């Protein structure tokens, strides 16, 4: 089966979401393979404007499978908010949206670390969105992040959360002088 890959090379804002939306009627699935909700894509269907941050824009095409892959970092609260907004507007998610169990979660402590790190850098700050994407990828690379599938196993989730909270609270207080 042939594949079409849309890749941006300018750190965002190149129109990947719009291009993906144009290609969507010609494919079986749209897969988001990396990134977080710090980015967004706006798609206009008819006279309706949709702004998506986590969910692939293919979701606006009925019956098209859309996948949030294992390379994506997901803010659960933001994802639920985005899903609810789509459902309110009549977009069907059941059977159309799939989320990898191996996708890592953006937790509140990731956002706190993102903001504390920026504050500590002062004039050298990088201009992060403060949504915790970078720190979530740090945990993914360090193999200590919490994944979507961990939400399905409460004892595992609680164990990972406790370990992460101990480490993140120490990092915030001792390195960043934050709470």
Language model features by range: what are they?
Residues 1-179:
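Non-transmembrane, aqueous-exposed alpha-helical and coiled segments at domain scale
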